[in-house]
């Protein structure tokens, strides 16, 4: 689950981190009034969506005119903002963040993720602020400095100082950076973050550190114990199909191909997508129906997959372990009849009662293609998607 910038900054403020005074507004009039409450003669107004690249897409504006703030809010509220990180539809803008303007002397990067290889929270800092960290990692990885947090001892001030020295901070800035680092590390664990970014973390013209932006991703598996953060969820930013899938405990991620994939198990699902790619196809989705692939869940999975008009064929790849393949086959048949599937369906069954499952499919009288292996299934579904 992701948070908006204004939500991230509200958490930053709770932990004593330096952020701009700002207000998230629902209407143009609120935005104008927010500028008046902030004071000064220069403000920054930002569209609030779960995507980067807002500035280049016209979703960020610096202005000293309150009427320009009104016009900006009237233009964007209720519309979709399209950036390089969204699809062609973009994401809806329901709030505008109005903030005081910050004079910038330099831009840094500070972020943290859960590193699965070390099984630790890893902080990353760089002098290349304001730039996509992925680009820095690819082109100049030596400019990214890391600190690994030991879960037994927690974050240590010396780790912050080590990063601060590498960023070239002066003694005053070092103290500020240490406070920011310790606050972020504590916040990361307290709220079960999966991702945290301040890009940029700026040095102002007065020489102080300031959190100019904020990006936070929460571990969805931990939301049951994070009611405060869970309440910040903005469903308007979710893909409609992904949100519908979650209601049925289906793990679905929309992609841009034409081969729908329905698989039980995340690892098998990724392997299925890989082999479809290997044979020249493009997966339209990642969909893991999990271990309890009942008729109802399979039917909903078909509905979700087929709600994508780009899908020209569907590959069902099931490994029967706890779940018997003959039961899965009956579920597939029932789902195909219920949904009225009009695209080719290729089914590969392996594991418990796989042969019986294939017999059930063969006797159904439906236009279901039973594959003999995963390679055979991939070849057949790619050809079917191409109309061959």
From Swiss-Prot:
The chain positions of domain ATP-grasp read 9-244
Q: What is its EC number?
A: 6.2.1.5
Q: What protein family does this chain belong to?
A: Belongs to the succinate/malate CoA ligase beta subunit family.
The UniProt record gives the binding positions of Mg(2+) as 199, 213
What Gene Ontology molecular function terms does this protein carry? ATP binding; magnesium ion binding; succinate-CoA ligase (ADP-forming) activity; succinate-CoA ligase (GDP-forming) activity
Q: What is this protein called?
A: Succinate--CoA ligase [ADP-forming] subunit beta
Role description: Succinyl-CoA synthetase functions in the citric acid cycle (TCA), coupling the hydrolysis of succinyl-CoA to the synthesis of either ATP or GTP and thus represents the only step of substrate-level phosphorylation in the TCA. The beta subunit provides nucleotide specificity of the enzyme and binds the substrate succinate, while the binding sites for coenzyme A and phosphate are found in the alpha subunit.
Q: Which gene encodes it?
A: sucC
Gene3D superfamilies reported for this sequence: ATP-grasp fold, A domain, ATP-grasp fold, B domain, Succinyl-CoA synthetase domains
Output the Pfam families linked to this UniProt entry: ATP-grasp_2, Ligase_CoA
Q: What is the lineage of its organism?
A: Bacteria, Pseudomonadati, Pseudomonadota, Gammaproteobacteria, Alteromonadales
Q: Which cofactor does it need?
A: Mg(2+)
GO BP: succinyl-CoA metabolic process; tricarboxylic acid cycle
Binding positions (ATP) = 46, 53-55, 99, 102, 107
**Any note on cofactor binding?**
Binds 1 Mg(2+) ion per subunit.
Q: Which organism is it from?
A: Shewanella sp. (strain W3-18-1)
Q: Does the keyword Cell division apply?
A: no
Q: Which domain of life is it from?
A: Bacteria
What cellular component GO annotations does this protein have? cytosol; succinate-CoA ligase complex
Pathway assigned in UniProt:
Carbohydrate metabolism; tricarboxylic acid cycle; succinate from succinyl-CoA (ligase route): step 1/1
UniProt KW keywords: ATP-binding, Ligase, Magnesium, Metal-binding, Nucleotide-binding, Tricarboxylic acid cycle
What this protein catalyses is: succinate + ATP + CoA = succinyl-CoA + ADP + phosphate; GTP + succinate + CoA = succinyl-CoA + GDP + phosphate
Where is substrate annotated to bind? 264, 321-323
Oligomeric and partner information: Heterotetramer of two alpha and two beta subunits.
């Amino acid at each position: 689950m992701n948070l908006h910038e204004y939500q991230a900054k509200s958490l930053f403020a709770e932990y004593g981190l330096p952020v701009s005074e700002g207000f998230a507004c629902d209407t143009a009039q609120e935005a104008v009034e927010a500028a008046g409450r902030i004071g000064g003669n220069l403000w920054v107004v930002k569209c609030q969506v779960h995507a980067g690249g807002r500035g280049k897409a016209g979703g960020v504006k610096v202005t000293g005119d309150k009427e320009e703030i009104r016009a900006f809010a009237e233009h964007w509220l209720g519309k979709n903002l399209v950036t390089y990180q969204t699809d062609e539809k973009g994401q809806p803008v329901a709030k505008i963040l109005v903030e005081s303007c910050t004079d910038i002397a330099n831009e840094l990067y500070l972020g943290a993720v859960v590193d699965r290889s070390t099984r630790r929270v890893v902080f990353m800092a760089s002098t290349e602020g304001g730039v996509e960290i992925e680009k820095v990692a690819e082109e100049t990885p030596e400019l990214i400095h890391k600190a690994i947090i030991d879960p037994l001892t927690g974050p240590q001030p010396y780790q912050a100082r080590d990063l601060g020295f590498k960023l070239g901070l002066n003694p005053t800035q070092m103290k500020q950076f240490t406070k920011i680092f310790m606050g972020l590390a504590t916040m990361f664990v307290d709220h079960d973050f999966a991702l945290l970014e301040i890009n940029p973390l700026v040095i102002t013209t007065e020489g102080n550190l300031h959190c100019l932006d904020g990006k936070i991703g929460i571990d969805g598996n931990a939301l049951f114990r994070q009611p405060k953060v869970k309440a910040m969820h903005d469903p308007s930013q979710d893909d409609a199909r992904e949100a519908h899938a979650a209601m049925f405990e289906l793990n679905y991620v929309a992609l841009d191909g034409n081969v729908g994939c329905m698989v039980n198990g995340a690892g098998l699902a990724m392997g299925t997508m890989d082999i479809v790619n290997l044979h020249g196809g493009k997966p339209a989705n990642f969909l893991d129906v999990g271990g309890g692939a009942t008729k109802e869940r399979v039917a909903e999975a078909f509905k979700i997959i087929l709600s994508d008009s780009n899908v020209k064929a569907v590959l069902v790849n099931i490994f029967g372990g706890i779940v018997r393949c003959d039961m899965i086959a009956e579920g597939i048949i029932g789902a195909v009849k219920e949904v009225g599937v009009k695209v080719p369906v290729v089914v590969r069954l392996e594991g418990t009662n796989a042969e019986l499952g294939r017999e059930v499919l063969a006797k159904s009288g439906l236009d279901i293609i039973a594959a003999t292996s995963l390679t055979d299934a991939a070849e057949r579904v790619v050809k079917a998607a191409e109309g061959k």
